């Protein structure tokens, strides 16, 4: 097992990465201060891991909420299912919530924990590659709105993140590839050696080589930690982690959640950002080809599956957390491994990229 620490002073917490961690009772229970525990999971994960986690909590008063699975359920109505269970079971402010599942479960559990009685503790047990390398780390929580993704939420840090790599054994290939999109993102952001490592090992990674999987999860979490400790509330450098997300969120919003998995939409969004970086004169056409090749080898989409008009794309793009004073801030690349927040880009080049992908 490897341990990383996210140092946020009084809000600091460990990130445990290893195999068979769901059998390590003390690893989990030492981060539970009260007597009441609510496990939040979904219909896919519950049959696989709920009982295993429950067996670690026999000395606690515990209950569970089993939510429907899917991004389309990341709503206020589903969030109320968690609040209803907490109130029905008379959970007090000393309780701890445990998020057992992927990014949707983690985001909603964190938001519920931040809101219930003005804030209670929670723990992340991510079970998808995407949530292990990205959404479980850093304290972002929230739900979607019909007009925009993740537009309602709050920052609320967990007490710990417990990443059991063995949970990926039950992850289907599409979900695994979707997680690889976020891993590739870290290679593009500021870790060129990591990008090269991914290029060299992508076939073994897609075959789920356990030591390599452990390495990419560790490196991804380490990179995100380095960003979050500098900018917890995303007022500056943390915005870099949104590479591909402005474009990707538009795709998810217009097509409807479920057509593309989040990671699949981010794959297309990253390629759009890379192509705009090329048109702006930063990247060579060969570098664009390298990125596209890596995405394809990870079995990720490189074009939009579905019909979206360019005008609708731009309209929805303006409803984004990264829009300030009506200006869309984009994350572009000066080089592979060197991202930056771009406020001044040529509108005609942005339109050119959008038109290319919306045909």
Swiss-Prot record:
It comes from Ruthia magnifica subsp. Calyptogena magnifica. Its main location: cytoplasm. InterPro entries: Dehydroquinate_synthase, DHQ_synth_AroB, DHQ_synth_fam, DHQS/DOIS_N, DHQS_C. Catalyzes the conversion of 3-deoxy-D-arabino-heptulosonate 7-phosphate (DAHP) to dehydroquinate (DHQ). One of its GO terms (molecular function) is 3-dehydroquinate synthase activity. Its EC number is 4.2.3.4. This is 3-dehydroquinate synthase. One of its GO terms (cellular component) is cytoplasm. It holds the Pfam family DHQ_synthase. Keywords: Amino-acid biosynthesis, Aromatic amino acid biosynthesis, Cobalt, Cytoplasm, Lyase, Metal-binding, NAD, Nucleotide-binding, Zinc. It is found in: Cytoplasm. Belongs to the sugar phosphate cyclases superfamily. Dehydroquinate synthase family. The lineage of its organism: Bacteria, Pseudomonadati, Pseudomonadota, Gammaproteobacteria, Candidatus Pseudothioglobaceae. GO terms for biological process: amino acid biosynthetic process; aromatic amino acid family biosynthetic process; chorismate biosynthetic process. NAD(+) binds at residues 69-74, 103-107, 127-128, 140, 149, 167-170.
């Amino acid at each position: 097992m490897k341990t990383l620490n996210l140092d946020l002073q009084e809000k600091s917490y460990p990130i445990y990465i290893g195999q068979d961690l769901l059998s390590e009772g003390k690893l989990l229970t030492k981060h539970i201060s009260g007597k009441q525990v609510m496990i939040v999971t979904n219909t896919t994960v519950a049959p696989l891991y709920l009982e295993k986690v429950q067996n670690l909590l026999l000395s606690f008063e515990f209950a569970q909420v089993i939510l429907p699975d899917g991004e389309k359920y990341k709503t206020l109505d589903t969030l109320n299912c968690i609040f209803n269970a907490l109130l029905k079971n008379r959970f007090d402010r000393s309780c701890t919530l445990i998020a057992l599942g992927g990014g949707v479960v983690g985001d909603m559990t964190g938001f519920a924990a931040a809101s219930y009685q003005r804030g209670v503790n929670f723990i992340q047990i991510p079970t998808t590659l995407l949530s292990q390398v990205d959404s479980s780390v850093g304290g972002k929580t929230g739900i979607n709105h019909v007009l925009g993704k993740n537009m309602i939420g709050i920052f609320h840090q967990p007490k710990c993140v417990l990443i059991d790599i063995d949970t990926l054994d039950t992850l289907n290939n599409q979900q695994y590839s979707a997680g690889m999109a976020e891993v590739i993102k870290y290679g593009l952001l500021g870790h060129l050696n990591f990008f090269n490592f991914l290029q060299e090992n992508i076939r073994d990674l897609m075959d789920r080589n356990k030591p390599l999987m452990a390495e990419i999860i560790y490196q991804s979490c380490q990179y995100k930690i380095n960003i979050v400790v500098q900018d917890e509330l995303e007022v500056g450098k943390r915005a870099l982690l949104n590479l591909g997300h402005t474009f990707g969120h538009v795709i998810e919003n217009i097509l409807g959640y479920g057509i593309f998995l989040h990671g699949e939409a981010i794959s297309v969004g990253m390629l759009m950002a890379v192509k705009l970086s090329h048109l702006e004169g930063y990247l060579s056409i060969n570098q664009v080809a390298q990125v596209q090749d890596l995405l394809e080898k990870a079995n990720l989409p490189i074009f939009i599956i579905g019909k979206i008009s360019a005008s609708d794309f731009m309209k929805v793009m303006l409803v984004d957390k990264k829009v300030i004073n009506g200006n869309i801030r984009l994350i572009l690349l000066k080089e592979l491994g060197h991202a930056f927040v771009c406020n001044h880009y040529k509108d005609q080049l942005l339109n050119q990229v959008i038109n290319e992908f919306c045909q």
